[in-house]
Design a protein with these regions (language model features):
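Alpha/beta-hydrolase fold catalytic core
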Residues: 1-65, 88-90, 310-313
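Conserved alpha/beta-hydrolase catalytic His-Asp/Glu region
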Residues: 2, 168-176, 187-251
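Conserved HGGG/HGGXW glycine-rich cap/lid loop of the alpha/beta-hydrolase fold
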Residues: 54-102
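Active-site loop/oxyanion-hole signature of alpha/beta-hydrolase fold enzymes
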Residues: 57-59, 84, 93-135, 303
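Flexible "cap/lid" loop of the alpha/beta hydrolase fold
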Residues: 144, 148-149, 153-191
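Short beta-strand/loop motif that positions the catalytic acidic residue
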Residues: 250, 256-258, 262
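Short alpha-helix in the alpha/beta-hydrolase fold that links the catalytic acid
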Residues: 252, 266-274
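Catalytic active-site module of serine/aspartate enzymes centered on a nucleophile-bearing elbow/loop
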Residues: 279-313
Length: 313
């Protein structure tokens, strides 16, 4: 029987790619830091630490930009192509959310509200008290919560394919391609090549085909095997008892970006979010793009980010 793990120990494409991203982030003027959010108290009953790429030499005359990732690979993979477009104009911060990359907590709270509170503590620990935010998918949930809880701290926000306005009943009403939440967690946190292939099909309009199982196993072993149950709890927490009527309306100027053919969070959720926020929000729908619009239509995605975040500076 073929032992993929033995081969992975000899060479890992995913680990090599991850190393290249680290070099790229470092060359862009960022450094990797893990921050203890337990206030250094050895007697604290819980511990929380967050990893973040932060500026090596922050310029306090520049505005601050917080880039929040979604499920899948770590933050570097999701923003690697766009980073250099912003480091010249912003102090850029790219954290790993809790249970991704090098961030974790012993707290039982799995809500995006708690993620947002930890992020605010992280940013304040680095002397950042006002910022703009880009949130992709799950990162958009956390970013929205940040904007709602700390309105005076957030200037602008970009929400990319973030189904913030979904409701628990949407699953029962058949809005999503998957039949139930359990199946959704198996796809979003793939543990087999078959489930990873499903995730790719759901994420891209034109998914790459014929990827050898070796590469799929490699990605899973490097990116998807840690904190599996905790990540599943994050997904379940999003949907549990969720009602649009309970969602606060944020006041910040907002840009909503959506892939027209998103199969994970259908476009209807983008329009629902626009109606919920109201006149402070504009929506951009990118054609021939799915949920991974930041990767599938990278140049168009970046064009809209720059127009919204930079042109008004």
């Amino acid at each position: 029987m073929f032992d993929h793990l033995k081969l992975l120990r000899c060479f890992s494409f995913t680990a090599s790619r991850d190393w290249l991203f680290k070099q790229s982030f470092s060359n862009a003027g960022l450094r990797s830091v893990i921050t203890d959010l337990s206030n250094g108290n050895p007697l604290a009953s819980t511990t929380t630490s967050m990893h973040c790429w932060i500026p090596k030499s922050p310029n306090r005359s520049k505005p601050n930009l917080l880039l929040l990732h979604g499920f899948g690979a770590n933050a570097m993979w999701q923003y690697g192509e766009h980073l250099r477009a912003f480091t010249g104009r912003f102090n850029v911060y790219v954290p790993d959310l809790l249970f991704f990359g090098l961030s974790s907590t012993s707290e039982p709270n799995r809500s995006e509200s708690f993620q947002a509170q930890c992020l605010m503590r992280l940013m304040e620990a680095h002397g950042v008290h006002r910022m703009s935010i880009v949130g992709i998918s799950y990162g958009g949930f956390v970013g929205y919560s940040l904007a709602a809880q700390f309105p005076e701290k957030v200037e602008k926000i970009v929400l990319c394919c973030a189904g913030v306005c979904l409701e628990e009943k949407d699953m029962e009403d058949g809005l999503f391609k998957v039949p139930n939440l359990e199946e959704a967690t198996k796809i979003l946190i793939p543990q087999t090549p078959e489930k990873l292939k499903e995730l790719i099909r759901f994420s891209f309009v034109k998914p790459i085909k014929g990827v050898p199982s070796f590469f799929l196993w490699d990605f899973i072993d490097v990116m998807c095997v840690e904190f599996v149950e905790e990540k599943r709890d994050l997904i379940k927490s999003i949907l549990k008892d969720r009602r649009l009527s309970d969602l606060p309306r944020i006041k910040q100027k907002s840009l909503i970006i959506w892939g027209e053919e998103d199969q994970i969070f259908p476009l209807e959720l983008g329009y629902r979010l626009k109606r919920h926020i109201g006149e402070n929000a504009e929506i951009v729908v990118i054609k021939k793009a799915g949920h991974a619009v930041n990767l599938e239509k990278s140049k168009e995605f970046l064009k809209h980010l720059k127009s919204f975040l930079i042109d008004s500076l």
